Amino acid sequence: MTESVFAVVVTHRRPDELAKSLDVLTAQTRLPDHLIVVDNDGCGDSPVRELVAGQPIATTYLGSRRNLGGAGGFALGMLHALAQGADWVWLADDDGHAQDARVLATLLACAEKYSLAEVSPMVCNIDDPTRLAFPLRRGLVWRRRASELRTEAGQELLPGIASLFNGALFRASTLAAIGVPDLRLFIRGDEVEMHRRLIRSGLPFGTCLDAAYLHPCGSDEFKPILCGRMHAQYPDDPGKRFFTYRNRGYV
């Protein structure tokens, strides 16, 4: 019997970007069995409700009267998916999307081949997919291009490293073991805290190097210090800066 995949997308006041994300999601060669959209601005006649209802697959619209942030939104969507009997939960936000129609099928195949509890695609710059949306540090070296993640010919998996939650695919049993995102973190750092839970669990996970999720570039937040020998994250937006440092201190 084919295992069920529930897609969970969290959105907040970006209906145009959400529409693009859902267009790619519903064009996958392996379609999700159900789509759950958590609307963090779900008061009154939200345009998102109509957008979700018009999708070509089974859907659930969850409108929240309170902005739960990415953390609370994903937690709500994940729990709803689990309650509906999902075997897999595939995550996305409203400002990014899968690179092509084969991403979900590729992630499922990678998880099956390597017996993974969670698998993520590479997260690449939506304006230049050859570059990573967020730099990845390996030792003292920052990797900024997707090609730099492969260290040998034919490599398919980067074990023990995953970007959450952009395109991340979780087994239901994994979420039962490590839990869902912490509502208190709201945004910024919720994915880091959950990544640490995933590491502590000892469950196998990694990044599939044959799949990509496109996301706006976040590299500009990493500012060079000590004449470029190191970098520090410093978001320009004061709200993002607050949650970045508050949550980093907590984690």
Q: PLM features: what roles do these ranges have?
A:
Residues 39-49, 96-97:
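A conserved acidic beta->alpha catalytic loop
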Residues 14-27:
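Short, well-formed alpha-helical segments that are part of the catalytic scaffolds
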Residues 101-134:
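Conserved donor NDP-sugar-binding/catalytic core segment of glycosyltransferases
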Residues 204-251:
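Active-site-adjacent helix/loop segment of glycosyltransferases
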Residues 86-95:
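Short beta-strand-to-loop acidic/aromatic patch adjacent to the donor-nucleotide binding site
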Residues 168, 174-179, 184-212:
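A short, conserved alpha-helix in the catalytic core of glycosyltransferases
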Residues 150-170:
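A recurrent flexible, glycine/aromatic-enriched loop bordering the glycosyltransferase active site
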Residues 64-84:
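Glycine-rich, basic loop-to-helix element that forms the pyrophosphate-binding segment
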